[in-house]
Amino acid sequence: MSYRKLGRTSSQRKALLRDLTTELIVNEKIVTTEARAKEVRSTTEKMITLGKRGDLHARRQAAAFVRNVVADVTEDGEDVKVSSALQKLFADLAPRYADRKGGYTRIYKTMPRRGDGAPMVVLELVD
């Protein structure tokens, strides 16, 4: 199994990938470095595939990886509905990609970062 070390220890790398994957699920677009984006693409594709499976074991596996953050807040009069990133993954993203076999993300290259010249990209979910 090959992966990028990203200049971090294993626990730091896992935390970084969890954070970036959750942000991509919530916002559907992130700006990051090229190496990070290529790693996050892999984990995001795995999470969306788990969302498409939709069984209890898939939900528990996704819940163990995706952070528990607020994805959306909607108000209906006095009712306030708060959905988490995990709920968005299973309720919104999984049905959207139900007929797609893979390739849920797209990477666009942008200008290098100003401070150190690191190659930057926009990682987004395909419509």
Curated annotation (Swiss-Prot):
UniProt GO cellular component terms: cytosolic large ribosomal subunit
Source species, domain of life: Bacteria
Gene3D superfamilies: Ribosomal protein L17
Ribonucleoprotein recorded as keyword: yes
Transmembrane segments: none
Keyword Mitochondrion (UniProt): no
InterPro entries (alphabetical): Ribosomal_bL17 (IPR000456), Ribosomal_bL17_CS (IPR047859), Ribosomal_bL17_sf (IPR036373)
MF-aspect GO terms: structural constituent of ribosome
Keywords linked to the UniProt accession: Ribonucleoprotein, Ribosomal protein
GO biological process: translation
Family: Belongs to the bacterial ribosomal protein bL17 family.
Oligomeric form and interacting partners: Part of the 50S ribosomal subunit. Contacts protein L32.
Protein name (Swiss-Prot/TrEMBL): Large ribosomal subunit protein bL17
Organism: Pediococcus pentosaceus (strain ATCC 25745 / CCUG 21536 / LMG 10740 / 183-1w)
Upper classification of the organism: Bacteria, Bacillati, Bacillota, Bacilli, Lactobacillales
Gene name for this UniProt entry: rplQ
